């Protein structure tokens, strides 16, 4: 039994949860300033313990389980979502990585594609028409945008000739070659994580709260812990694939962290700026715009890779 290995992985997961907690605080602070008001500032020093106060409040509440719901998948779906989000953090490509996966990009695609099951299970098992409609929207949206996401990732892999995130660290020029690819990738990430302007799985103005309408207390917290952990890991992988640096050691880790924070702040900026799209516009965007563009960039990447 490799004790240092498990200790390293456990520390990565604990720090990922801490990062997720403070990211929720950062989002609330930023949204407050966007709305010309103060964010959370009453709990402790400048509101810093606010995420932990929220977590304690939610997890000590009684869990209400609707009688018509299918109990086992209803309880299992939020836990599954958080576990899948944390599984992606295992391949965090820092300079002293202990968990080495040669095909980490393939691992990332496999785990991220499983997230659709958590949305579907949560909506279907709630036995509520609003939750089911939100789940069906979320499933259709996620599957549609995964096609473009896979093609964009494939274009990057053809040029970089590696499926290992740690080796992608040394390539710093792909963003300048494929700026349209990076923009489409970021918009696809917004759809994959169900964030504004693609938050149709929730759709408060139409579906009360969407697929999570029947959830409360700790299970509700688990759903949103998974969502924010996914946002951070998507920001991290965007930094690795498109914004890698030539620096090494501690400097590369620091640059990666700063890039990830910047991209995570961009998620908040988009939420504060744009309204929710119409659902038919969402589907037209991926099938009529992103898919042809992704295929065109994929065809361009093959001769570029041959010339390098």
Swiss-Prot record:
The keyword Acetylation does not apply. It is found in: Mitochondrion inner membrane. The lineage of its organism: Eukaryota, Metazoa, Spiralia, Lophotrochozoa, Annelida. GO terms for biological process: aerobic respiration. Keywords: Electron transport, Membrane, Mitochondrion, Mitochondrion inner membrane, NAD, Respiratory chain, Translocase, Transmembrane, Transmembrane helix, Transport, Ubiquinone. Core subunit of the mitochondrial membrane respiratory chain NADH dehydrogenase (Complex I) that is believed to belong to the minimal assembly required for catalysis. Complex I functions in the transfer of electrons from NADH to the respiratory chain. The immediate electron acceptor for the enzyme is believed to be ubiquinone. Belongs to the complex I subunit 1 family. Its main location: mitochondrion. It comes from the Eukaryota. Its EC number is 7.1.1.2. This is NADH-ubiquinone oxidoreductase chain 1. It catalyses: a ubiquinone + NADH + 5 H(+)(in) = a ubiquinol + NAD(+) + 4 H(+)(out). It comes from Lumbricus terrestris. The chain crosses the membrane at residues 3-23, 73-93, 103-123, 143-163, 168-188, 217-237, 250-270, 288-308. It is a multi-pass membrane protein. It is an enzyme of class 7 (translocase). The keyword Nucleotide-binding does not apply. GO terms for cellular component: mitochondrial inner membrane.
């Amino acid at each position: 039994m490799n004790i240092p290995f498990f200790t390293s992985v456990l520390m990565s997961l604990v720090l990922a949860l801490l990062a997720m907690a403070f990211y929720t605080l950062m989002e609330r602070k930023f949204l407050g300033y966007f709305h010309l008001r103060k964010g959370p500032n009453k709990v402790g020093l400048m509101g810093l313990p606010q995420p932990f106060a929220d977590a304690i409040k939610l997890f000590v509440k009684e869990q209400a389980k609707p009688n018509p719901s299918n109990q086992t998948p209803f309880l299992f779906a939020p836990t599954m979502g958080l576990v899948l989000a944390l599984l992606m953090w295992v391949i965090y490509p820092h300079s002293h990585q202990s968990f080495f996966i040669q095909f980490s990009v393939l691992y990332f695609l496999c785990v991220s594609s499983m997230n659709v099951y958590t949305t579907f299970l949560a909506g279907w098992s709630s036995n509520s028409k609003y939750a089911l409609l939100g789940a069906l929207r979320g499933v259709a949206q996620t599957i549609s945008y995964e096609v473009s996401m896979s093609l964009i990732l494939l274009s990057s892999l053809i040029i970089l000739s590696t499926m290992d995130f740690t080796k992608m660290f040394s390539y710093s020029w792909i963003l300048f070659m494929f700026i349209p690819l990076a923009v489409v990738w970021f918009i696809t990430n917004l759809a994959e994580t169900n964030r504004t302007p693609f938050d149709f799985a929730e759709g408060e103005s139409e579906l009360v709260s969407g697929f999570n309408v029947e959830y409360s207390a700790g299970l509700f917290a688990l759903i949103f812990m998974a969502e924010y952990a996914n946002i951070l890991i998507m920001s991290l992988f965007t930094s690795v694939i498109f914004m890698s640096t030539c620096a090494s050691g501690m400097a590369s880790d620091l640059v990666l962290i700063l890039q990830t924070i910047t991209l995570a702040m961009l998620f908040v900026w988009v939420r504060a700026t744009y309204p929710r799209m119409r659902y038919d516009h969402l589907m037209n965007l991926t099938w009529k715009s992103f898919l042809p563009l992704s295929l065109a960039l994929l065809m361009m990447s093959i001769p570029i890779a041959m010339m390098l």
